[in-house]
Amino acid sequence: MKTVLIQVGKTVNKHFIAGINDYVERINHYMPFEVVTIPELKNTKSLSEEQQKQTEGELILKQLQPSDTVVLLDEHGRQYRSIEFARWIENKQQTARRLVFVIGGPYGFSPAVYQRANEQLSLSLMTFSHQMIRLTFTEQIYRACTIIKGEPYHHE
């Protein structure tokens, strides 16, 4: 199974970039993992929040294949403890060809993206910046990989 993380806009904080790159490299020792960055919209002052979500949504949908299992990182999604998330990933490895996680733009997702999604996942009841969640989520994917393999990274 290939796992993909789609994100809207570049990560700009050099410390986050270094951390994300480190976890992506580690994850690739366990499974094929790729980060796809959709360019940030330009000249958004004349666009409403809904128009921005619509345009970003179209760009997100273009990245998806019909057979993809699509999971949105969304504040209203299901929450898992790390071990539960690892078991969820392990199950998806048996049933999905390509597992695609999506981190939306600053205003969230368009209705079309919600409609296409198979599931929604929330990492916390708290709100994080889109920049921060990229690092946090890649670490959680890595943590799940080590739990699945029984390696001593995660401590209960």
For each feature predicted by the language model, list its residue ranges.
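A structural signal for isolated positions on well-ordered beta-strands in alpha/beta enzyme cores
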Residues: 2-4, 34-36, 100
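Structured adenosyl-cofactor binding patch, chiefly the S-adenosyl-L-methionine
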Residues: 111-155
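Short glycine-rich anion-binding loops that position phosphate/pyrophosphate groups of nucleotides
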Residues: 11, 75-78, 105-108
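N-terminal beta1-alpha1 ligand-phosphate binding loop
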Residues: 1-27
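S-adenosyl-L-methionine/SAH cofactor-binding core of RNA-modifying enzymes
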Residues: 32-33, 37-97
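Short glycine-/acidic-enriched loop or helix-start segments at secondary-structure transitions
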Residues: 15-17, 81-83, 110-113
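Short, surface-exposed alpha-helical segments at coil->helix boundaries
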Residues: 17, 21-24, 54-57, 111
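A mid-sequence interfacial segment
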Residues: 86-124
